[in-house]
């Protein structure tokens, strides 16, 4: 409809301006224009067809594709319509430029032909003076370019009115009609532009509002999310702190209540136990008093016999325990003797056996403990004693007697001090060590009493030329004879004589043999102490 109205308006305006520019008048009767009317009908029909096709194509895409593919010039018209429909101000700019150019041509034509009209004024039939009404269109909220177009047209109309042109009545009516049509078309265009602008503003406003609402919702959602996260974090921290504080307070209160209840329960249990003990004692006392005159008349005699029996059992138990301790002591001593005399063991450590002997000795000493009184019985066992209290208990006031240490404990102490943390060599190991001292013994036999480094070297060199004496030793006191006698004694396990021979040495030979003397003496001392323990245990 917009294209049709615009095209009609342009045609009418051209006709009116063309008749005005020529200045000719028609006095004869208006001829019929059948061919022109036919062309107008065809043009209007084609315009209506294309306009309807374009409008329906905007509403239906399938019809639009069919219309643009099968109707000539339809695709170009659709592109032009979409071009001006998206930017309606372009059409106003083009229309305004066309009108402005035509107005300039009209004014130039009027000016150029004014003299011709004056010369031919007598031959023209003047019917009416041209007087057009200005375009009274409300342009308060209209497009600025449309305002400019309406203002230019009003200036053109005022110029035509001021020129006082006389035209025939038919042309006057045609121009009047064209003016009315132009007013109507401009009013429609103004309303269309207002509506389009209003729709555009409403659409843009709705889009902006939608976009702002979306941004607001996103910001609101993000803010709510962050706020919720912060609040949850603060609530969790507050909850955790409050839980810890309350748990601590509850634990302290529970602990205090538990202590209070325990103390209260202990007091109640103590009071109840005291009451029960009193009641029990009272019941027992009553029953004893009742039974004492009946079946328990001989209770004291039975009690004395039971005491005698328990004493006999205690004495028997002590005797049995003592015998068992003696057996174990004998076994441990025999074990030590067998380990010391075993030549298959190069060295022996008897710390475990000593600890067992020590334990058995302490146990045996408890069985041999005497009473504190001279007659062998403790005063606490005597009846009718003056120290007897109300409850029948007797406090012994005898001075305690200190028993002298036994030979067994003394021997064990000596054995412990001799062998504690040290190893005892076998006879074969002692003999082998003595053979290892042969070279050093020969070197020491050649050294003077106060030898230096030179004397040491000289003795070492000359000792290489000495021979070790073996065989049946003589009673001589030279070093070779002593070495031979010691070796012979060790070979027959006569360790005592061998140690005496080595101890009798003096000077460097004695100093060379100090370590060997220490090991041999330890072996002799252990043997003697073990023999003492064996004899003492057999006498117990």
From Swiss-Prot:
Transit peptide start-stop: 1-17
Transmembrane residue ranges: 38-57
Highest taxon of the lineage: Eukaryota
Keywords of this entry: Coiled coil, Membrane, Mitochondrion, Mitochondrion inner membrane, Transit peptide, Transmembrane, Transmembrane helix
Main location: mitochondrion
Keyword Nucleotide-binding: no
Compartment(s) where it occurs, according to its Swiss-Prot or TrEMBL record: Mitochondrion inner membrane
Mitochondrial matrix domain ranges by topology: 18-37
InterPro entries registered for this protein in UniProt: MIC60
Reported phenotype of the disruption mutant: Increases frequency of mitochondrial genome loss and leads to altered mitochondrial morphology. Moderately reduces mitochondrial membrane potential and import efficiency of preproteins that are transported into or across the inner membrane via TIM23 complex. Impairs precursor protein import via the MIA pathway. 60-70% of mitochondria exhibit an increased inner membrane surface and stacks of lamellar cristae disconnected from the inner boundary membrane.
GO CC field: MICOS complex; mitochondrial crista; mitochondrial crista junction; mitochondrial inner membrane; mitochondrion
Membrane topology annotation: Single-pass membrane protein
Complex and partners: Component of the mitochondrial contact site and cristae organizing system (MICOS) complex, composed of at least MIC10, MIC12, MIC19, MIC26, MIC27 and MIC60. This complex was also known under the names MINOS or MitOS complex. Interacts with TOM22 and TOM40 in a MICOS-independent manner, resulting in coupling with the outer membrane. Interacts with MIA40, OM45 and POR1.
Function per UniProt: Component of the MICOS complex, a large protein complex of the mitochondrial inner membrane that plays crucial roles in the maintenance of crista junctions, inner membrane architecture, and formation of contact sites to the outer membrane. Plays a role in keeping cristae membranes connected to the inner boundary membrane. Also promotes protein import via the mitochondrial intermembrane space assembly (MIA) pathway.
Extra remark: Present with 5730 molecules/cell in log phase SD medium.
Protein name according to UniProt: MICOS complex subunit MIC60
Taxonomic source organism: Saccharomyces cerevisiae (strain ATCC 204508 / S288c) (Baker's yeast)
Gene name of the record: MIC60
């Amino acid at each position: 409809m917009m294209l049709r109205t615009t095209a009609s308006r342009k045609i009418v305006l051209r006709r009116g301006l063309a008749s005005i520019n020529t200045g000719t008048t028609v006095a004869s009767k208006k001829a019929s224009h059948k061919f022109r009317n036919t062309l107008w009908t065809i043009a209007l029909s084609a315009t209506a067809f294309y306009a309807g096709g374009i409008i329906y194509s905007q509403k239906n895409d399938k019809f639009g594709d069919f219309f643009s593919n099968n109707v000539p010039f339809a695709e170009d018209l659709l592109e032009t319509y979409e071009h001006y429909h998206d930017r309606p101000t372009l059409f106003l700019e083009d229309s305004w430029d066309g009108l402005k150019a035509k107005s300039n041509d009209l004014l130039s034509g009027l000016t150029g032909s004014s003299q011709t009209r004056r010369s031919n004024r007598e031959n023209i039939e003047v019917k009416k003076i041209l007087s057009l009404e200005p375009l009274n269109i409300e342009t308060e909220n209209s497009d600025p370019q449309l305002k400019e177009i309406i203002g230019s047209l009003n200036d053109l109309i005022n110029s035509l009115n001021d020129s006082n042109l006389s035209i025939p009545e038919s042309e006057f009516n045609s121009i009047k009609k064209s003016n009315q049509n132009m007013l109507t078309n401009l009013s429609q265009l103004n309303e269309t532009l207002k509506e389009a602008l209003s729709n555009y503003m409403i659409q843009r406003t709705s889009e902006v509002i939608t976009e702002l609402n979306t941004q607001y919702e996103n910001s609101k959602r993000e803010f709510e999310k962050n706020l919720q996260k912060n609040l949850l974090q603060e609530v969790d921290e507050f909850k955790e702190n409050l839980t810890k504080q309350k748990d601590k307070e509850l634990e302290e209160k529970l602990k205090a209540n538990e202590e209070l209840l325990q103390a209260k329960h202990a007091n109640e249990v103590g009071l109840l136990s005291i009451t029960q003990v009193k009641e029990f004692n009272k019941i027992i006392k009553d029953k004893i008093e009742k039974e004492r005159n009946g079946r328990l008349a001989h209770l004291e005699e039975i009690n004395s016999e039971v005491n005698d029996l328990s004493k006999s059992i205690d004495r028997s138990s002590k005797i049995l325990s003592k015998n068992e301790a003696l057996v174990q002591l004998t076994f441990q001593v025999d074990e030590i003797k067998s380990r010391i005399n075993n030549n298959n063991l190069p060295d022996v450590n008897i710390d475990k056996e000593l600890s067992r002997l020590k334990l058995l000795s302490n146990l045996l000493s408890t069985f041999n403990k005497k009473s504190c009184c001279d007659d062998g019985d403790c005063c606490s066992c005597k009846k009718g004693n003056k120290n007897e209290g109300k409850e029948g208990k007797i406090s012994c006031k005898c001075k305690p007697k200190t028993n002298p240490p036994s030979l067994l404990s003394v021997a064990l102490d000596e054995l412990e001090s001799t062998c504690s943390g040290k190893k005892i060599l076998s006879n074969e190991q002692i003999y082998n060590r003595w053979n290892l001292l042969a070279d050093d013994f020969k070197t020491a036999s050649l050294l003077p009493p106060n030898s230096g480094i030179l004397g040491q070297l000289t003795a070492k060199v000359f000792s290489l030329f000495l021979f070790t004496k073996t065989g049946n030793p003589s009673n001589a006191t030279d070093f070779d004879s002593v070495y031979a006698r010691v070796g012979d004694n060790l070979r027959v396990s006569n360790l005592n004589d061998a140690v005496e021979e080595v101890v009798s040495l003096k000077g460097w030979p004695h100093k060379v043999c100090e370590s060997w003397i220490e090991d041999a003496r330890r072996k002799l001392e252990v043997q003697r102490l073990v023999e003492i323990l064996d004899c003492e245990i057999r006498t117990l």
